[in-house]
């Protein structure tokens, strides 16, 4: 159920208004926030199933004193409320312009996956467990030692 909630907040400057709007927008279920009122001291919150009590308590903690002014249910427009001008106009068929299909670019790299460590098999001769069992043979799939450039182009003098 979509609803409009009007809340009066003790806002005196623009920074307080911005903080109140930011706090209200971050709340769960809120779709839109507007500043209303003659003194710009009210905000109108539009959303779906917004917990207004928790919203007011959060505004009181983070911004300033807040009180609930009104709550109104927003009904979607009905099909019978269409403008008569739209019904009188004959439907004109426009030639459809074909848009070229947009292809998504393929990623240049594969997503990172955690490598599976390999372990030595369990000794089956029954003489105990090695002290380092199980140990990964190559946990990061690195082959050999890293190679450092011995002759860099940039020299520090």
UniProtKB/Swiss-Prot annotation:
This protein's UniProt keywords: Lipoprotein, Metal-binding, Methylation, Prenylation
A GO molecular-function descriptor: metal ion binding
Propeptide: 155-157
Modified residues (Cysteine methyl ester): 154
S-farnesyl cysteine-type lipidated residues: 154
Residues in HMA domain copies: 2-71
Positions with biased composition (Basic and acidic residues): 75-106
Region (Disordered): 73-115
InterPro entries with a match to the protein in the record: HIPP47/16 (IPR042885), HMA_dom (IPR006121)
PANTHER family linked: HEAVY METAL-ASSOCIATED ISOPRENYLATED PLANT PROTEIN 47
Described function: Probable heavy-metal-binding protein.
Similarity-based family: Belongs to the HIPP family.
Name of this chain's protein: Heavy metal-associated isoprenylated plant protein 16
Organism whose genome encodes this protein: Arabidopsis thaliana
């Amino acid at each position: 159920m979509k609803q409009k909630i009007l809340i009066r907040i003790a806002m005196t400057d623009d920074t307080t208004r911005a903080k109140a709007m930011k706090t209200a927008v971050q709340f769960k279920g809120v779709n839109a926030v507007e500043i209303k009122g003659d003194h710009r001291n009210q905000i109108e919150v539009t959303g779906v199933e917004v917990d207004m009590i928790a919203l007011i308590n959060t505004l009181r903690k983070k911004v300033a004193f807040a009180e609930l002014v009104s709550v109104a249910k927003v009904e979607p427009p009905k099909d019978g409320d269409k403008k008569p001008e739209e019904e009188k106009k004959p439907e004109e068929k426009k030639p459809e312009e074909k848009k070229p299909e947009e292809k998504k670019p393929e990623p240049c790299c594969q997503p990172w996956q955690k490598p599976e460590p390999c372990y030595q098999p369990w000794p089956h001769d029954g003489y105990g467990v090695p002290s380092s069992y199980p140990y990964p043979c190559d946990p990061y799939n690195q082959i050999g030692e890293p190679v450092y450039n011995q002759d860099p182009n940039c020299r520090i003098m």
